[in-house]
Each structure stands twice: as structure tokens, then as C-alpha cells.
Curated annotation (Swiss-Prot):
Homology family: Belongs to the class-II aminoacyl-tRNA synthetase family. ProS type 1 subfamily.
Pfam families in the cross-refs: HGTP_anticodon (PF03129), tRNA-synt_2b (PF00587), tRNA_edit (PF04073)
MF-aspect GO terms: aminoacyl-tRNA deacylase activity; ATP binding; catalytic activity, acting on a protein; proline-tRNA ligase activity; transferase activity
Protein name, UniProt field: Proline--tRNA ligase
HAMAP family to which the protein is assigned, alphabetical: Pro_tRNA_synth_type1
Keyword Oxidoreductase belongs to the record: no
Domain notes: Consists of three domains: the N-terminal catalytic domain, the editing domain and the C-terminal anticodon-binding domain.
InterPro entries in the cross-refs: aa-tRNA-synt_IIb, aa-tRNA-synth_II, aa-tRNA-synth_II/BPL/LPL, Anticodon-bd, Anticodon-bd_dom_sf, Pro-tRNA-ligase_IIa, Pro-tRNA-synth_IIa_bac-type, Pro-tRNA-Synthase_IIa_type1
Gene Ontology terms describing biological process: prolyl-tRNA aminoacylation
Compartments, record wording: Cytoplasm
Keyword Nucleotide-binding: yes
Enzyme class: ligase
Native source organism of the sequence: Finegoldia magna (strain ATCC 29328 / DSM 20472 / WAL 2508) (Peptostreptococcus magnus)
Biological function: Catalyzes the attachment of proline to tRNA(Pro) in a two-step reaction: proline is first activated by ATP to form Pro-AMP and then transferred to the acceptor end of tRNA(Pro). As ProRS can inadvertently accommodate and process non-cognate amino acids such as alanine and cysteine, to avoid such errors it has two additional distinct editing activities against alanine. One activity is designated as 'pretransfer' editing and involves the tRNA(Pro)-independent hydrolysis of activated Ala-AMP.
Length: 576
């Protein structure tokens, strides 16, 4: 492609609303443009990258036995009512009506669509297993879209679904797709970790997330170097020791604690460690009061609570002051004794002795409280958020923490959707059975963002060869020099004949502008044709190292072909 005709509107400065490197650089390089909050257009360079990621995903899905289909973006309300998710999915779902007042949504995911399709077509165990996928636009009305295409309202995603005869076969399909996803992310050149994840609104019994490591990632993972333990901070079990076995229980006592509303204030005033000052989290769950009590030195893990309550997270809100007063309690002084509402307690509280709780009266707490003697509630094994200093439950070694971007996820759905939507087949005995399902997703456009986050410097992006918009850029230093033009054209045509994807910078621009743009857009292999063109000498460099080496045009051509042939399975076919 000749750049004098190429649509690549680069920017010299970072856009003001861009927060992270990928957002800044993709905008500056003229690869994307913001249309509205969370909505982006992909320009020629950017769209080539998206298509390459998409095609890598497509090839590995095909290699691992998944068949591609294409389904509508618009999904009817009826199938979401069948699954029970029309109301529970939450405000992230875009909803609309047609001219006949029939309700639809813009698909945020596709479990319902795929289940509805298969239940009408697959009737016998002889037609199983089935593995089908699509690469399609998804929509989620994010409350706060940010970070460019990393968290947008409209995004491209691959979603696959497996249908099997039993739980064992579902597990085999799950591991097959696990391996396929590993190959995809390895080919994309991402540094990532696979961690146990929270199933959330998807449901199911088991899930894992593929997290591309990045300091700007919104997700946090924890892992151990001494075992296979790895999980998101939402999923990780907290190994929290309470050493009160030999402590003698004391009699409870109401004490004055003027203006002590926080754990820190109560701990300091009563000279009691923070862990033994019970933290009350005052919530309204589906309109009803629920108080959660946990050790005072920890934070409540909302994902674990949602999993226990089995209700949508958007149905859980913090209590307003009037809600607390209606319970005959006092804001900042809520305690479990005498409360007439649902009480949920982390199991570690049951093991503690002589802790402090709010007295449900302003400026008062009760000390030396003990579970079972003074109050009771629903015990949940683990409601705590993992934090620095926690240890691996298996090896007791300290956990390590890293931030990351979720680029893929896999779920064992079991029979959640087949049962709710009555999707069945006949087994070998002629008996009706529900499908065992798996769900799998790769964020195609989010993967593009993650690749940039892991591959950039202060000059611009550094694309891995496999997803680069072009393999090579040839820069003509002076387009008024006929010998430079001739040599550049010769190299350009020669590489094109081999199926190499080449950008020829033949613009009538200052050479500094050309070099800056070249660094910014991050084409991995670079040939500069300059003042030594008459001697058949060019400069070759790689974007990752920026080291310029003079060589003949033939040597430069051979160098390009050597690198491409060693890095790509094929050129000009698979990745075009």
C-alpha cells in the first residue's frame, strides 16, 4: 500500500480524554476514532489488526473442531425470559422495541441464542458432541466506559458453545477449548495467566479467565509460585486464621464510644485490634435489609456475597440513613444484637471470641461479644476480599498480586440453560436428557488493546509480526531523488510478489514526520531508502530494537524474508 493514498490521520499530541497507553496510541496513530462514549470506529490500519486477531482466533477454533456460524445481533425478549435473565442481567443490557412494540435486546452475550438454536435442531445423542462459535459484535451499556477499546459499549467478541451428552464429556470439551485458547493467546504474543474466575451472571459451576498482565488492567489476580493456585481477587479463597481457641469468653458490656464510627476509631478508643472490631455492611438486597458482618480488618467481597445470595449485583445497594434508622439502629453503630433483619456472617466471626460490635445506638458499642451466646445468623464460609499478605491455602506461602486485562474466559455451564430453556435430546436408551453445556469467549478488540499495553515505548506501538497491520514499511527519505524512488519501488514490488504486506511511505513529507509516524504506528520491520540508494545501500531496522544496519537492498530483502518465514506459518494467505 502506498502511503500517499492511505487514510491514516495521525495526531501529534495525546488526546485529553485518553488515560492509558493503548487508548492514546491507537488514537494518535489514526487507527481508531471515538464516535461517542464507549463507541469507536476502526480506521484502515486499526481494522487490519482487528481482522488479523480475528483470523487467528478463527483458525484455532477450526483446528480444535469448532464450527463457525453467524447469528443476529438483535435478540428477542422471549428467549431471555426463558433463561430468566431478562430482568436479572442488569442495566448493562441495551433494550429496544420494534414498530410492533415487540421487545428485543442488543446481544451482550449469546447463551440464550445458541441454546434456542440447538434445541430446535439437535434431537439425538448421535448428533453430539457439538461445538459451534461466532465472531460477532456485542453490546453492553457500561456505566463508565473507559480506556478506549479496553472497556467499551460495543466490542467484537468470539463466543463458542459446546453441547455434550454428560458431565464428563462437557469437561473434556472444556479442556479442549482451554488448550485452543492457550494457542490463540500464545500466537498473539501475550503474556498472560490462567486463573480461576467468578461465574457471575453467566452461571455454571466452574470458570477460568485468561488475564493479559498489565499495570493498567482493571482486574487483579493472585497466585502462588509454589503451587497451581491462581485466581481473580473476586474468586480467591481467603485463608484467614483466628487464634482464639484458648481465649476465655468474657461477659458482654455496653460501652460509650463517642464519635467512633469507623473501625480504626473504635479500635484505637477501646484498644482492641481491628480484626476483633466487627465490621457491619448495611445493604438493601432486592429491597429488603440485609446486614453482613466480617472481621474489621477485612473488606467484603461483593462477588462472593452475590454468589451466596443468588441475586443480581445491581439488586444490592448500600442502605440509606433512613433505612438504618428504620431498623432501630444508628448509622456507624450497627450491630447484630437485637436486629430484626437478615444477618449474614463470615465464618471466621464464629471462631472469634470477645469481639466488639455496634450497639445500634449512637455513640455506643458492645464489647466481649461472642457468636452463639449473644447473636446468631447465616454462616458463609468465605466472604472476604483477598489482600496483600494473604497466603496460599495449600502451601501457606505468600500470595503474589498482579493487575491484568481479561481477554478470554471459559465456563462450565452444566445444565443451567438447557434446563431453564427445556433444551433436550434423546440418549441411547431413548430417554430425554438435558444438554451439558460450556461457554467460551475471547475479546477480539480488547486483545488488540492488551497487545498494545504490552508492546509499546515512548515513541509508539511495537506490533508483533503476526498481528501487525503490515509486515514491512519502506521509507523514502527524499521523494525528489529518482534513485531513491526507483530502489524503493523495486524492493516494494519484490516483497509484494512474495505475499509480504508492505507499506511504502512515498509521501511528500519531511523525513522527520515520516520517521515519527513510522515509530508511532509500530510496523515491525523497516527499510529506509536514503542518500546511498545509488550504491544500492539501504538501512534495515526492527521496531523493537531501533538499531539501524546498512546493507544492500538484496540483503535487506533476504533479511525480511528470513524473519517472516521464521515467525509466520505462511505469508499472504493465512493472515491477509
Amino acid at each position: 500500500m502506498r502511503m500517499n493514498k492511505f487514510y491514516m490521520p495521525t495526531l501529534r499530541e495525546d488526546p485529553q480524554d485518553a488515560e492509558i497507553a493503548s487508548h492514546k496510541l491507537l488514537l494518535r496513530a489514526g487507527m481508531i476514532r471515538k464516535t461517542a462514549a464507549g463507541l469507536y470506529s476502526y480506521l484502515p490500519l486499526g481494522y487490519r489488526i482487528v481482522r488479523k486477531v480475528e483470523n487467528i482466533v478463527r483458525e484455532e477454533m477450526d483446528n480444535y473442531g469448532s464450527q463457525e456460524i453467524h447469528m443476529p445481533i438483535t435478540q428477542p425478549r422471549e428467549i431471555w425470559e426463558e433463561s430468566g435473565r431478562w430482568k436479572t442481567f442488569g442495566p448493562e443490557m441495551f433494550k429496544l422495541k420494534d414498530r410492533n412494540n415487540r421487545e428485543f435486546c442488543l446481544g451482550p452475550t449469546a447463551e440464550e441464542y445458541f441454546t434456542d438454536l440447538v434445541k430446535g435442531e439437535i434431537k439425538s445423542y448421535k448428533q453430539l458432541p457439538l461445538n459451534i462459535y461466532q465472531i460477532q459484535t456485542k453490546y453492553r451499556d457500561e456505566k463508565r466506559p473507559r480506556f478506549g477499546i479496553n472497556r467499551s459499549r460495543e466490542f467484537l467478541m468470539q463466543d463458542a458453545y459446546t453441547f455434550d451428552v454428560n458431565e464428563e464429556a462437557m469437561g473434556e470439551a472444556y479442556m479442549n477449548m482451554w488448550r485452543a485458547y492457550e494457542v490463540v493467546f500464545n500466537r498473539l504474543g501475550l503474556e498472560y495467566k490462567i486463573v480461576a474466575g467468578d461465574s457471575g451472571a453467566m452461571g455454571g459451576n466452574s470458570s477460568h479467565e485468561f488475564i493479559a498482565l498489565s499495570d493498567v488492567g482493571e482486574g487483579v489476580i493472585c497466585y502462588s509460585d509454589d503451587s497451581d493456585f491462581a485466581a481473580t481477587d473476586e474468586k480467591a479463597y481467603v485463608y484467614y486464621q483466628v487464634n482464639d481457641e484458648n481465649v476465655e469468653k468474657l461477659s458482654s458490656e455496653k460501652v460509650l464510644t463517642p464519635n467512633c464510627k469507623t473501625i480504626e476509631e473504635v479500635s484505637d478508643f477501646l484498644n482492641v485490634d481491628a480484626a476483633h472490631c466487627l465490621k457491619a455492611v448495611d445493604l438493601m438486597v432486592e429491597g429488603k435489609p440485609v446486614i453482613v458482618f466480617i472481621p474489621g480488618d477485612r473488606e467484603l467481597n461483593m462477588s462472593k456475597l452475590v454468589s451466596y445470595l443468588k441475586c443480581p449485583e445491581h439488586e444490592i445497594e448500600m442502605m440509606e440513613e433512613q433505612d438504618i434508622l428504620a431498623l432501630n439502629s444508628s448509622p456507624g453503630f450497627t450491630g447484630p444484637i437485637g436486629l430484626d433483619c437478615r444477618i449474614i456472617i463470615d465464618s471466621r466471626v464464629k471462631q472469634m471470641k470477645n469481639f466488639v460490635v455496634g450497639a445500634n445506638e449512637e455513640n455506643y458499642h458492645i464489647k466481649n461479644v461472642n457468636y452463639g451466646d449473644d447473636f446468631e445468623g447465616e454462616i458463609v464460609e468465605d466472604l472476604l476480599m483477598v489482600q496483600e499478605g494473604d497466603i496460599d491455602p495449600e502451601t501457606k506461602s505468600p500470595l503474589k498480586f498482579k493487575r491484568g486485562i481479561e481477554v478470554g474466559n471459559i465456563f462450565q455451564l452444566g445444565q443451567k440453560y438447557s434446563k431453564s430453556m427445556n433444551a433436550t435430546f434423546l440418549d441411547e436408551n431413548g430417554k430425554e436428557q438435558f444438554f451439558w453445556m460450556g461457554s467460551y469467549g475471547i475479546g477480539v478488540t480488547r486483545s488488540v488493546s492488551a497487545i498494545v499495553e504490552q508492546n509499546h515505548d515512548d515513541k509508539g506501538m511495537i506490533w508483533p509480526l503476526v498481528v501487525a497491520p503490515y509486515h514491512v514499511i519502506i521509507t523514502i527519505v527524499n521523494t525528489k531523488d529518482e534513485e531513491q524512488n526507483t530502489l524503493a519501488e523495486k524492493l516494494y514490488e519484490k516483497l509484494l510478489l512474495q505475499g509480504v504486506e508492505v507499506l511504502l511511505d512515498d509521501r511528500k513529507e519531511r523525513v522527520g514526520v515520516k520517521f515519527n509516524d513510522r515509530d508511532l504506528i509500530g510496523i515491525p520491520l523497516r527499510i529506509t531508502v536514503g542518500k546511498k540508494a545509488a550504491e544500492d545501500i539501504v538501512e534495515f531496522s526492527e521496531r523493537r530494537t531501533l538499531e539501524n544496519v546498512e546493507m544492500s537492498s538484496t540483503e535487506a530483502y533476504e533479511k525480511v524474508m528470513e524473519i517472516i518465514n521464521s515467525n509466520l506459518k505462511s505469508v499472504g494467505g493465512l493472515y491477509r
